[in-house]
A protein has these predicted regions:
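Helix-loop "lid/cap" segments that line or gate small-molecule binding pockets
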Residues: 52, 70-75
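Short, well-structured N-terminal submotif of metal-dependent ribonuclease cores
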Residues: 1-40, 54-67, 112
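Alpha-helix capping/helix-boundary segments
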Residues: 9, 44-45, 85, 105, ...
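A generic structural signal for nonpolar/aromatic side chains embedded in well-ordered alpha-helices
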Residues: 68-69, 89, 123
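Active-site neighborhoods of divalent-metal-dependent phosphate/nucleic-acid chemistry enzymes
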Residues: 59-63, 73-119
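Short beta-strand segments
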Residues: 40-42, 118
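Active-site regions of enzymes building and remodeling cell-envelope glycoconjugates
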Residues: 127-132
Length: 132
């Protein structure tokens, strides 16, 4: 099965972090191995740039993400923020998920009909399918 990865999920996957749960890691690895790919919302790339600028993430995190997104063998592909995502956005309750990037990531998963791999408890309570 393919999936949409939350920002922290893709960054932890790419750095082989122990923060990533075993279930999350298996989900990503299985999708990549079986050539189903995993999706990363374009907003995650923007969010990573912002966090590097704010010095909350090292530049290497952004470099790994950009490298994965440009390497077809990585199995990580970008999911655009498009009209379908905008149409799905009202289905992500703002009172449960107040952060706009998180709402966009959740709406991307909903629009694509894929589970969202996330540790974020707010997203896990947003009424969408999640994996952790």
């Amino acid at each position: 099965m393919s999936a949409v990865l939350d920002t922290h999920t893709v960054l932890w996957y790419l750095e082989n972090s122990k923060e990533l749960s075993a279930v999350a890691r298996t989900t990503v690895e299985d999708a990549v191995r079986d050539a189903r790919h995993v999706r990363v919302s374009a907003i995650s790339l923007v969010e990573t740039v912002y966090l590097v600028e704010r010095r909350r993430l090292p530049l290497t995190a952004l470099e790994r993400l950009r490298s994965a997104l440009t390497d077809p063998s990585s199995g990580v592909i970008i999911a655009p923020v498009d009209a379908g995502v905008a149409d799905a956005l009202p289905n992500i309750p703002r009172d449960v998920v107040p952060d706009m990037p998180d709402r966009i990531i959740a709406a991307t998963a909903l629009h694509l009909g894929l589970p969202l791999v996330t540790r974020d408890r707010r997203l896990q309570s947003a009424g969408i399918q999640t994996i952790w």
